Amino acid sequence: VGISTFYRLLEEHGTAQCALEHLPEVARAAGVDNYIPHGEEHVIAEMRRGQKAGAHLIFRGTPAYPAGFNDLNDAPPFFWAVGDPTLLHRPTLGLVGARNASSLGTGMSRFLATTLGEEGYVICSGLARGVDTAAHAAAIGTGTIAVLGGGVDVVYPAENAQLTRQIRENGLLILNNPWEPNPKRGISPYAIG
């Protein structure tokens, strides 16, 4: 269930529990036969697996949820976080750019991330090669958030393994699922508000 469908089901059925109970008929109406929702034991196992990976859930409507996300039309109802969630409540700027960036591009990314970080901004990017990598590396000491398209158990790109560890320890990773095995180039789960 995607974000738009989640909110539509919630609006139609009033509560998440009621929406879950109606999922099989919603799936049938969408042409999906024999849909069987996961049981409570699966949900508990997923939660434990996330906690074991060092991740915790942040739900919309809780104090940990970033206020800026509420302004998004497709604000995630929840997401996983690994690292320092207090970074979500500081002023944040996104720095993204070319994966195959020139030395001028990566140099400018480092300069902007350093300068803005010193002014109190958290730098947010997607941990891709090039500009993203340069921005995160420069902002480790002042605050950085990496928005991942995959999970914490598969680093993509592989050359960012050490940077990912540093962000886990000194920044924040946010993601849809803490163990999605197949991150895909160009996929970022959310826009940072």
Model-derived regions: residue spans:
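Short, small/acidic-rich helices and loops at N termini and domain boundaries
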Residues: 1-62
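Glycine-biased, small-residue-rich flexible motifs in mid-sequence functional cores and linkers
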Residues: 57-193
